[in-house]
Amino acid sequence: LVRSSNEGTTLLHQQADIIRALGIAPSFDAAAETERRVAFLADYLRTTALRAYVLGISGGVDSLTAAMLAQTAVSRLREHGHTAEFVAVRLPYGVQADEADAQKALAAIRPDRTVTIDIKPAADAMLAEVRREAGELFEAARVDFHLGNIKARQRMIAQYALAGAVSGLVIGTDHAAEALMGFFTKFGDGAADILPLSGLTKRRVRAIAKHIGAPQELIDKVPTADLESNAPLRPDEDAYGVTYDEIDDFLEGKAIAELARQRILTMYTASAHKRALPVTPE
């Protein structure tokens, strides 16, 4: 495929615009970024006059990294005389296939408090009621997809209920790679009060995780949203159609294969509504 110089320039400008919009820094130092984000979490909690951070722990590197940053931040606040705690929340849908990884994550985080809430009864009840009242609107082939979104939103309902009980804020785990691909559920895992991993590529999240002492096996774990009951532990990259290395290279301004670039741009455009606030009339 041969492109004109004008078309190539347009694509480079588009890539640069996306990098700027998602806040990816041109350089990265794991130690400096760790400190900056811990300070960010500590300062924000202190200025809100709230007393806790709440975060769902899945067993993946994103929630593990965000949680370790948060636990460090609240510990620092307590050292300076402030009331602060970190509440880790396990939110399995029945029995989680990789529960052992979630427990390893908790052991690494050492949260002030751990709460476990099974979302299966609530998620199943909601799906059943919606299907009972609007079943003809549901394509049979997409029921599992809809249930996956219900799971994500039910998890956020639980986290906000818990945050209200402890005067806390909910932490989200969204980072630049997921934001680029729109790989989150609106008002589910996409809902949060604070995003300590914002502006990071996946490899940079892993670099911070390594710097703060996360278990290597969880750093290297194949990422999965694990929302589909019919495809448990489906890798993120399978859903993307591109690899995290390709996504990260794109976000770091590097050249990637044309098919991968087009896939990324297509998903970025299609998911624009997910990254926007609710639209209003002018």
Model-predicted regions and their roles:
Residues 1-55, 61, 65-69, 190, ...:
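Peripheral terminal appendages
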Residues 11-180:
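ATP-dependent adenylation/nucleotidyltransferase module used to activate substrates
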Residues 67, 71, 103, 160, ...:
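Predominant activation on well-ordered alpha-helical scaffold segments within soluble catalytic domains
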Residues 85, 111, 144-147, 173-241:
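Catalytic subdomain that performs nucleotidyl-dependent activation
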Residues 92, 196, 215, 223, ...:
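Proline-rich low-complexity regions
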Residues 109, 129-133, 187, 212, ...:
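Alpha-helix boundary/capping residues
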